[in-house]
């Protein structure tokens, strides 16, 4: 005699794809001056998911190195940084390696960076490059609120495939939004949207002229607009074959745009320019 038969699995259950593991990385960091003229110290730090911060010793200023232990971003992952500098604090933020945005079968990954700088605070936002692979889909948001006397220098380098391997972005999504406010007023806004055959879009003369990598450098600091001629001279010194760059200044800030046939030469241009413009060496991880 047999017991009751178990119901047959439904076709939906038989063909169901396993649930994906989504990465959800979060960093919250608040820093402030240790004492008048005595450097900067960590006041609050919270880490979640695969996001970690490391603080190398022996650096001139407090330096935070962002680590993504997941090894990259893909398929609907979410990462966020909430960074606050109290009045008078100084910080350099970078990443341990290039951030890789891997292919997705549909879900869009999201990266949100939110910065708050008090009066007299100074932040150098210097992550290493971001590399997009074919069919990557990502939306990034960069928002900063600065007191009138705060100083922000931010640099971002993005590679659309690895030129040395002949990679192309046949289909993908790259949406990048920058909003920076000074004293509560919007000082800088920029949005980039590349969707579909990104490499083909970049091949158009009016968009990228065949570039495979781009960079943005922004200086929102007191006196930045007056440094335009210096910036142009330093760009000329930093240039290398396969790169092109230009600087402009308005509304109290200075912006640099650069393009490269490959990310390596463009990264070199950015590093040389920033080292001269800031009169400080790049973070050590940039040299590894």
From Swiss-Prot:
Its main location: cytoplasm. Keywords: Chaperone, Cytoplasm, Nickel insertion. GO terms for cellular component: cytoplasm. Residues 1-10 have a biased composition (Pro residues). It is found in: Cytoplasm. It holds the Pfam family UreD. Residues 1-35 are annotated as: Disordered. InterPro entries: UreD. UreD, UreF and UreG form a complex that acts as a GTP-hydrolysis-dependent molecular chaperone, activating the urease apoprotein by helping to assemble the nickel containing metallocenter of UreC. The UreE protein probably delivers the nickel. Required for maturation of urease via the functional incorporation of the urease nickel metallocenter. HAMAP family: UreD. Belongs to the UreD family. This is Urease accessory protein UreD 1. It comes from Methylobacterium radiotolerans (strain ATCC 27329 / DSM 1819 / JCM 2831 / NBRC 15690 / NCIMB 10815 / 0-1). The gene is ureD1.
């Amino acid at each position: 005699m047999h017991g009751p038969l178990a119901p047959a699995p439904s076709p939906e259950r038989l063909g169901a794809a396993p649930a994906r593991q989504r990465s959800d990385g979060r960093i919250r960091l608040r820093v402030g001056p240790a004492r008048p003229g005595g450097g900067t110290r960590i006041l609050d730090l919270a880490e979640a998911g695969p996001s970690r911060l490391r603080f190398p010793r022996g650096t001139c200023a407090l330096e935070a190195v962002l680590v993504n232990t997941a090894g990259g971003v893909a398929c609907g992952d979410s990462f966020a940084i909430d960074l606050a500098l109290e009045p008078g604090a100084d910080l350099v933020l970078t990443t341990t390696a290039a951030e890789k945005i891997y292919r997705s079968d549909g879900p869009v990954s999201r990266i949100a960076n939110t910065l708050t700088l008090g009066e007299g605070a100074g932040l150098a936002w210097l992550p290493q490059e971001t590399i997009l692979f074919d069919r990557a889909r990502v939306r990034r948001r960069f928002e900063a609120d600065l007191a009138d006397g705060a100083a922000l220098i931010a640099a971002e380098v993005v590679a659309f495939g690895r030129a040395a391997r002949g990679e192309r972005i046949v289909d993908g999504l790259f949406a990048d939004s920058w909003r920076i406010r000074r004293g509560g007023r919007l000082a800088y806004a920029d949005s980039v949207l590349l969707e579909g055959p990104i490499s083909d879009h970049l091949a158009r003369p009016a968009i990228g002229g065949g570039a495979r990598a781009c960079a943005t450098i922004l200086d929102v600091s007191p006196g930045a607009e007056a440094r335009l001629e210096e910036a142009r001279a330093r760009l000329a010194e930093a240039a290398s074959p396969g790169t092109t760059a230009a600087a402009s200044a308005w509304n109290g800030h200075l912006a640099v745009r650069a393009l490269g046939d490959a990310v390596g030469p463009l990264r070199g241009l950015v590093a040389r320019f920033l080292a001269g413009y800031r009169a400080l060496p790049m973070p050590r991880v940039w040299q590894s």
